[in-house]
Design a protein with these regions (language model features):
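Core alpha/beta nucleotide-donor-binding catalytic domains of modification enzymes
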Residues: 2-157, 167-171, 176
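Short, hydrophobic/aliphatic alpha-helical segments
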Residues: 2-5, 189, 381-385
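A structural signal for well-ordered alpha-helical segments within the folded catalytic domains
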Residues: 18, 39, 43, 143, ...
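Short Gly/aromatic-enriched secondary-structure transition segments
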Residues: 48, 61, 231-233, 360-362
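Class I S-adenosyl-L-methionine
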Residues: 105-112, 125-323
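Short, small-residue-rich loop/turn micro-motifs
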Residues: 122-126, 220, 349, 379-380
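C-terminal target-recognition/interaction regions appended to catalytic cores
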Residues: 267-415
């Protein structure tokens, strides 16, 4: 592009806990506004917004004191930051009814300036393979959220947009949904493309997780761009040795949301990725409690995993089987691969930890909030507001930060 700029601005729609946004901020982009309907996720973004402002103004100690405090008064933390920044995190569902008000808040924040980029993707449950079986897609309003996304494109006319979603969006209604989205976007004046292999995988961006996502990138027709080629990162890092080893071993139900010291020195992976980023303590290393029945199953699952097999729920001793419909629970219990990368972390982690069993048999538990956040490549000073369950849900729904940063760097080159 002909105009050289130092900073590019973006709006993050359906922002969740801010994983995508964090990656773009790391790549030098400036957020104008975040829009998210979940209150806990909004509070998380407000706290992260405070972190970035305090860091830029050399006042990180205020943020660190907040992390260390046992009472955590987030409103007090936010008071240290210009009010308009906190107000730029808009806690609203995006709908026909709320659009005028959302636009008004963003316009005030923009103060006549342009928006260079819109990022974000509507909640993925609607397009996910699982979600589809449950509901008649036509009547689910979430399937029409892309129309509101297009309204933001029409109003703010950014140079580019990045639309993130689950692989299920490709096959939803035999591809009809995707073509509807493409058509609407083209009518708004944009060229649009998906990756040559249909999706990108987080593990190619240095994330220790096998997570496929469809990243749709669009640009104004006159810009004459094409879908970028992403560099993939080859590495042999492993979950247990490189991602979890410095955290204190915990048993079922142990841990705290508050600050605790690291148990061991950092690792090369944690340094390279800036996950463990300079603090001498970590928060939210807390595990949910499970009953004895589940814990016995965890032990069996880990033994089988170590022998190269996955646990089949139906083959457990009868006394341990609590669900009559064993077919739908075949893969209910899954161990995180300690000697490789994790399987995909999803929001269901908030319901129970059975799908994310810690690979160390001695600890016999599901993974902690902080371990889940690390699998999603969130830095250790990223604090998730709300309850333990709320934190798990935010993490499961997020875009991994390292993946977001890799995408953001390419988008910046294109701009």
């Amino acid at each position: 592009m002909d105009k050289k700029k130092d900073t590019f601005t973006f709006i993050d729609l359906f922002a969740g806990a801010g994983g995508l946004s964090e990656g773009f901020i790391r790549a030098g982009f400036n957020p104008v506004a975040h829009v998210e309907m979940n209150k806990d996720a909004c509070d998380t973004i407000k706290t992260r917004t405070a972190y970035h402002w305090l860091k830029d103004n050399k006042k990180t100690s205020i943020y660190n004191d907040y992390l260390k405090s046992e009472t955590k008064n987030k409103e007090e933390l936010w008071k240290n930051v210009p009010e308009h920044l906190i107000n730029s995190v808009i806690n609203k569902e995006i709908s026909e009814k709320t659009l005028p008000e959302i636009f008004k808040t963003i316009d005030k924040e923009l103060n006549g300036n342009e928006v260079d980029l819109i990022i974000g993707g509507p909640p993925c449950q609607a397009y996910s393979i699982v979600g589809r079986a449950r509901k008649d897609m036509e009547s689910d309003p979430r399937n029409h959220l892309y129309k509101h996304y297009v309204k933001f494109l029409e109003k703010y006319k950014p140079m580019m947009f990045v639309f993130e979603n689950v692989p299920g969006i490709l096959s939803a209604k035999n591809g009809e949904y995707l073509s509807k989205i493409f058509k609407a976007v083209k009518n708004a004046g944009y060229e649009v493309s998906i990756p040559p292999k249909n999706h990108l995988n987080a593990k190619d961006f240095g994330v220790l997780q096998d997570r496929k996502r469809v990243i749709i990138i669009g640009w104004k027709k006159e810009l004459n761009l094409k879908y970028p080629e992403f560099d993939t990162s080859e590495h042999n890092f492993q979950i247990l040795k490189d991602l979890f080893s410095d955290l204190k071993p915990l048993k079922n139900g142990q841990g705290t949301l508050n600050a605790v010291e690291y148990a061991k020195p950092t690792t090369e992976y944690l340094k390279q990725t800036n996950i463990r980023n300079g603090l001498d303590f970590v928060t939210q290393h807390i595990v949910r409690p499970n009953n004895d029945n589940d814990l016995e199953i965890y032990q069996i699952a880990i033994d089988q995993w170590n022998n190269g097999k996955r646990l089949n729920y139906a083959e457990l001793p009868k006394r341990l089987i609590k669900h009559s419909n064993t077919d739908s629970f075949v893969n209910r219990f899954q161990v995180v691969n300690g000697k490789g990368v994790s399987h995909t972390v999803v929001a269901h982690i908030a319901m129970d930890g059975h799908y994310y069993i810690h690979p160390d048999k001695k600890q016999n538990r599901s993974i902690s909030v902080r371990e889940a956040a690390r699998i999603q490549s969130f830095p250790d000073d990223y604090f998730f507001e709300g309850s333990r369950t709320a934190a798990f849900k935010q993490i499961g729904n997020a875009v991994p930060v390292l993946m977001a940063e890799g995408i953001a760097k390419k988008v910046r080159e294109m701009l």
